């Protein structure tokens, strides 16, 4: 894997900066403001992705605020320029979901992912603008999805990964009814400056316990565990080099105003004296394909690619993770050519070690 691909597999789009919640770990800088994406931005992106969607599966991920806060009429107008081959995904806090939104999801074949951190007592960081618990509203929205038979994924943020927690979380999500589950260990990024450094043994034990819980009842597609097992299988088959893509997915994030940040959505909306605003262009003035073709010319991206090569040279886990994410390098270290981050320790290194620990502990006994 070298360089940045000129063809993404999906585009992240920000229909509004506004979020009706005020989660303590959120990285977004403008979530109190309602800056809505003009339809002209959506139309420019739709024109760019049309040829890509004809040759591969292609998705638009509506994220970067609470997408439902943009309203059904405006979101429908943003969807309209895209062809039928483009999949639409929404990451939502679920608090606004009602039957009318379910009608919208079904009419537009939207794939829904909800953000919820486990049982009610695990959602203390997810609060309203008045700093009141949001769990009841989240759970109510999820109940509407289930009543309407709309499949959904779930995204769970874990603030303190430690032994005893993983089984509780997995059992909760089994009962919740999600089809896919992603586990994100809280990250120090954006406006969230809280440290995410944890004892290595605790994090490894958390992931190992999660594997055990999943193996007992693997009804849920557990994102991190399944990816780890695919990598382990590839190593055993001698195909480890084929796991990572040949080039980095550029993951273009198109902000509400059309500006484009590549590789890490978490950098959108931030500014640095050295790197500027991290953007590589704006779809209102430059076609997205042209922006992607010139990605390496963005100074911070060139520095990031140097960091990726440093990871390749020095880290035995590179074949699994492909190098620390750009935003984590920047928000933890202030630059992009560093290597190991707390995020990669928590969510890559300890993850793989936890999976391998579980495998060793449950290795069949020779007869």
Model-derived segments and spans:
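Conserved, mostly hydrophobic/aromatic
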Residues: 19, 23, 62, 90, ...
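Radical SAM enzyme [4Fe-4S]-AdoMet core and its adjacent flexible, acidic
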Residues: 129-136, 143, 147-260, 265-283
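Short flanking/linker segments adjacent to small metal-binding domains or redox-active Cys/His motifs
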Residues: 76-79, 319, 360-367
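Short Fe-S-cluster ligation motifs
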Residues: 47-64, 338-367
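Canonical Radical SAM [4Fe-4S] cluster-binding loop centered on the CxxxCxxC motif
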Residues: 5-40
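Accessory C-terminal segments flanking Radical SAM cores
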Residues: 227-345
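Cysteine-centered iron-sulfur cluster-binding motifs in ferredoxin-type domains/subunits
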Residues: 15-22, 66, 310-314, 318
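Radical SAM/AdoMet-radical enzyme domain recognition
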Residues: 44-61, 70-199
């Amino acid at each position: 894997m070298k360089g940045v691909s000129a063809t993404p597999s999906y585009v992240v789009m920000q229909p509004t900066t506004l979020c009706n919640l005020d989660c303590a770990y959120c990285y977004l800088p403008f979530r109190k403001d309602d800056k809505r994406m003009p339809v002209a931005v959506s139309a420019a992106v739709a024109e760019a992705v049309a040829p890509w969607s004809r040759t591969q599966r292609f998705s638009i991920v509506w994220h970067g605020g609470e997408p439902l806060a943009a309203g059904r009429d405006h979101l429908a107008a943003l969807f309209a320029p895209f062809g039928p081959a483009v999949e639409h995904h929404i990451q939502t806090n679920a608090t606004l979901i009602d039957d009318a939104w379910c009608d919208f999801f079904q009419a537009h074949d939207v794939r829904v992912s909800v953000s919820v951190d486990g049982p009610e007592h695990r959602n203390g960081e997810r609060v309203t603008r008045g700093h009141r618990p949001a769990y009841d509203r989240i759970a109510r929205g999820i109940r509407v999805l289930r009543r309407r038979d709309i499949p959904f994924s779930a995204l769970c943020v874990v603030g303190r990964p430690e032994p005893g927690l993983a089984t509780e979380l997995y059992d909760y999500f089994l009962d919740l009814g999600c089809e896919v589950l992603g586990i994100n260990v809280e990250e120090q990024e954006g406006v969230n400056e809280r440290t995410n450094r944890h004892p290595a043994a605790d994090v490894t034990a958390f992931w190992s316990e999660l594997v055990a819980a999943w193996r007992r009842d693997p009804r849920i597609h557990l994102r991190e565990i399944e990816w780890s097992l695919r990598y382990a299988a590839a190593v055993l088959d001698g195909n480890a080099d084929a796991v990572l893509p040949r080039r980095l997915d550029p993951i273009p994030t198109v902000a509400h105003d059309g500006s484009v940040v590549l590789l890490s959505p978490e950098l959108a909306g931030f500014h640095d004296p050295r790197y500027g605003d991290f953007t590589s262009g704006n779809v209102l003035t430059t076609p997205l394909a042209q922006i992607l073709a010139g990605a390496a010319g963005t100074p911070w991206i060139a520095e990031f690619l140097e960091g990726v090569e440093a990871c390749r040279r020095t880290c035995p886990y590179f074949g699994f993770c492909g190098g620390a994410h750009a935003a984590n390098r920047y928000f933890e270290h202030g630059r992009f050519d560093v290597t190991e981050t707390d995020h990669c320790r928590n969510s890559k290194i300890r993850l793989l070690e936890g999976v391998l620990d579980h495998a060793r502990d449950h290795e069949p006994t020779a007869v």
